[in-house]
């Protein structure tokens, strides 16, 4: 897992060069946007259970067969596993947002996820839909457009952070499908 600083150092070291130029400017911007980044992560984690439960509910509303006998969310145990997986995915998305780097998401969450879901018979289209609902909710909390906010968000334009979290959710969807 690399954070924004480690990534710059590793890249500079690989080139046998000092950290400078555009890398240094990118780090300055990363630091300047630090409070927005922390507030964005806080917005996600403070609303995580709502984000995940809404995503799973939305997925089920669109595919009621999931809760019918034989469906992948039928029985409390399977529903709990679905909610747990959503929480884990969202947690790693928040880690990636905090670090400013997707490697923690890729290495510790997405690596082998599709194969696991296939082996368990989890319908990928429903999982992708749940992730897209989580993406929309996370972006709404970051951009302060969510209707049920629990906390205030940072002042200023957070569209870059919203785009960043959206890209992490897109990575999850791509890894599952």
From Swiss-Prot:
Protein name: R-phycoerythrin beta chain
A GO BP annotation: photosynthesis
Posttranslational modification: Contains two covalently linked phycoerythrobilin chromophores and one covalently linked phycourobilin chromophore.
One Pfam family matching this protein: Phycobilisome
Localization: Plastid, Chloroplast thylakoid membrane
Naturally occurring in which organism (per UniProt): Pyropia tenera (Nori)
Record bears the keyword Iron: no
Single GO cellular component term: phycobilisome
UniProt key word Isomerase: no
Origin superkingdom: Eukaryota
Gene name linked to the record: cpeB
Lineage: Eukaryota, Rhodophyta, Bangiophyceae, Bangiales, Bangiaceae
CDD domains recorded: PE_beta-like (cd14767)
Physiological role: Light-harvesting photosynthetic bile pigment-protein from the phycobiliprotein complex.
Sequence positions that bind (2R,3E)-phycoerythrobilin 2: 158
């Amino acid at each position: 897992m690399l954070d924004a600083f480690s990534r710059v150092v590793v890249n500079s070291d690989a080139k046998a060069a000092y950290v400078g130029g555009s890398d240094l400017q990118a780090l300055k911007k990363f630091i300047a946007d630090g409070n927005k980044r922390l507030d964005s992560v806080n917005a996600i984690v403070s609303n995580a259970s709502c984000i995940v439960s809404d995503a799973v509910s939305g997925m089920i509303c669109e595919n009621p067969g999931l809760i019918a006998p034989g469906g992948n969310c039928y029985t409390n145990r399977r529903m709990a596993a679905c909610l747990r997986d959503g929480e884990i995915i969202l947690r790693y998305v928040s880690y990636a947002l905090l670090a400013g780097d997707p490697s923690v998401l890729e290495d510790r969450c997405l690596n082998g996820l599709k194969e696991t879901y296939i082996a368990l018979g989890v319908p990928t289209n429903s999982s992708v839909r749940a992730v897209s609902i989580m993406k929309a909710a996370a972006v709404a909390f970051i951009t302060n457009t969510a209707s049920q906010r629990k906390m205030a968000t940072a002042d200023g334009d957070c569209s870059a952070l919203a785009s960043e979290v959206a890209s992490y959710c897109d990575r999850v969807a791509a890894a599952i499908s």
